[in-house]
Regions:
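Flexible, processing/modification-adjacent segments and terminal tails
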Residues: 57-59, 130-202
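Edge/loop elements at the starts and ends of beta-strands within beta-rich repeat scaffolds
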Residues: 65-73, 83-88, 95-97, 118, ...
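An acidic-aromatic
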Residues: 101-154, 158, 291-294
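N-terminal leader/targeting segments and the immediate start of mature chains
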Residues: 23-86, 294-304
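C-terminal motif of bacterial Sec signal peptides marking the signal peptidase cleavage site
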Residues: 18-21
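Gly/Pro-enriched, hydrophobic low-complexity segments
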Residues: 23-28, 171-288
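One face of beta-strands
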Residues: 71-79, 90-94, 100-106, 116-118, ...
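Bacterial N-terminal signal peptides that target proteins for export
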Residues: 2-11
Length: 304
């Protein structure tokens, strides 16, 4: 409709110019032709912009349509964490229930006993250290590296579930898709899809043909303390119903803590991806465990 309206306006404008020039000199007639040509140029530009907008929306819709329908994602995994000069690899398990919890359990090799648990819920972050019988429970504003990134549960959930996200929104709706920008002029296999929100910049790289997200980048601009960045790379996609889920996720976080640049890498390699729902989404911490300060979350993770 917008294209048709633009054409009608252009035709009307040309007609008015022709009528105005009927009793005028040749010079005025020439001016009418120039103005008519300008109108045609403007119409072509408007049409091109409309087509580009439709292509942008169609691609973003393709990316959004790749999200899995399952309520639960569960699977044993190999967990690797590199931070503070340490490199730790242990067996583990990833359990996620949509809109409720993201849980990472770490086990003692061979024995299989749980040594630690990292849990994200809509209201808090929970870290349980079984070896030292300690735990951290805090909301997202109390955890330094999450606060720096401006990350909450729903943004984390979208990143773990290999989906697009709109900051501050629980679920991306069809009307939200217009907020994303897809750089279809890129010639690479993956197309950048981005959205800005205040000091936050989110960018995904999605396959041009399938729309499947291969990488996500989150950047938080902070002039006072320096930028923070979170990069995720997805691979080894496995079938979950009619959709695909990345069994391997590699995350790199760079930020400033205590006025020093810090980098942490977290790698998850799931051996299988299941949709089992026979598990409790809430962790009850024993009264024998001591609650400690949430200030040094990375330190607590590395001490497990």
């Amino acid at each position: 409709m917008k294209v048709m309206n633009n054409l009608k306006m252009a035709v009307a404008a040309v007609a008015l110019l022709l009528m105005a020039s009927c009793g005028s000199t040749k010079k005025m007639e020439g001016t009418g032709k120039v103005n008519a040509q300008n109108r045609k140029t403007e119409t072509k530009a408007a049409d091109a912009a409309e087509v580009a907008s439709m292509k942008n929306l169609a691609f973003v819709q393709k990316v959004a349509d790749n999200q899995v329908y399952a309520k639960n994602i569960v699977g044993n995994m190999t967990f690797n964490l590199q931070a503070a000069g340490k490199d730790i690899t242990v067996p583990g398990k990833l359990s996620m229930r949509k809109d409720e919890v993201i849980r990472i359990q770490l086990f003692i090799p061979i024995l299989g006993s749980e040594v630690g648990r990292l849990e994200f819920t809509p209201n808090y972050v929970l870290i349980v250290d079984r070896l030292h019988k300690e735990y951290i429970k805090a909301d997202y504003t109390q955890v330094d590296f999450l606060q720096k990134q401006g990350i909450n549960f729903y943004s984390l959930q979208a990143l773990f579930w290999n989906q697009l996200l709109v900051p501050g929104v629980k679920k991306v709706s069809d009307s939200d898709l217009k907020k994303f920008s897809a750089n279809l002029d890129e010639t690479a296999e993956n197309v950048p899809v981005s959205i800005r929100y205040g000091n936050m910049n989110y960018q995904w790289k999605a396959n041009r043909n399938s729309g499947r997200i291969a990488e996500a980048n989150v950047t938080y601009k902070d002039k006072g303390n320096g930028d923070s960045r979170l990069n995720l790379k997805y691979s080894d996609f496995k079938s979950v119903g009619v959709k695909m889920f990345p069994a391997t996720q590699r995350m790199t976080l760079t930020t400033i803590l205590n006025n020093k640049p810090q980098e942490a890498k977290l790698n998850i390699e799931m051996k299988s991806v299941k949709t089992d729902d026979k598990w409790d989404a809430q962790t009850e911490v024993s009264g024998k465990y001591k609650q400690v300060s949430p200030k040094d979350v990375l330190g607590k993770l590395m001490s497990m």
